[in-house]
Amino acid sequence: MIDAVEKTEGKQAVRVLLVDDHDLFRTGLRNLLEEQGLDIVGEASDGGQAVRMTRELAPDVVVMDLNMPGMTGVEATRQVTTAAPLTRVVVLTISDQDGDVLDAILAGACGYLLKDSSVDELIRGIVAAAVGESLVSPAIAGKVLQQVRATAISPEAADTIRAELSDRELDVLKLIAAGNDNAMIAAQLHISPKTVKNHISNILMKLQIENRIQAAVYAVRSGLV
């Protein structure tokens, strides 16, 4: 089991806001995550409350359900990532519908997990989000890529993307889209993890996107992978 307390290289435990309209599920999830060393700073039962509490509490990660009354999880994700750029959103839902997954990612979610995920997978997803990584449930990753490929951008737009990025940044982008984490990218390109992080920051800035999952979407749509 990943030690969530140690995830940030000696820093404090990951601060998490839970968002789900089912009280019993939230309580069980809270107990589970606290047992693993995560700091649950609050709970919200709908999207609007999630946005308000994010502004107040500035959690590291928001664990977000999609299907809630009132504001949807997708819209709440969009507002959370706009209001608090340093807060990461991990979607935790029963929905494996292609449209829901892609909508959540494009809204700014940096992780998408199903509620039947293992405890290890859930903890990995939250910890990964807290340090700027991403995790999509393996059960739906392939479906997402198929949908992304079906909405490929024009060759002209793809050429523009290639022109914006350096050769090394293109290499990093391809490896992100192939599912590699920072350490794996560093090893394959024979550069340091810190250099990988710098390249990723430049890629996100140049493409005007929020996270590495969106970067992977760009890579697939532009035909890089």
Regions found by a protein language model. Give the residues of each.
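Two-component/phosphorelay signaling modules centered on CheY-like receiver
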Residues: D23-G42
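Acidic catalytic/metal-coordinating carboxylates
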Residues: D46-Q49, T72-E75
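Active-site beta3 strand of CheY-like receiver
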Residues: L57-V63
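Active-site residues of response regulator receiver
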Residues: D65, T93
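Receiver (REC) domain active-site loop signature in two-component systems and cognate sites
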Residues: M68
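Regulatory hinge/linker segments at domain boundaries
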Residues: Q146-L175
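Recognition helix of helix-turn-helix DNA-binding domains
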Residues: G179-Q214
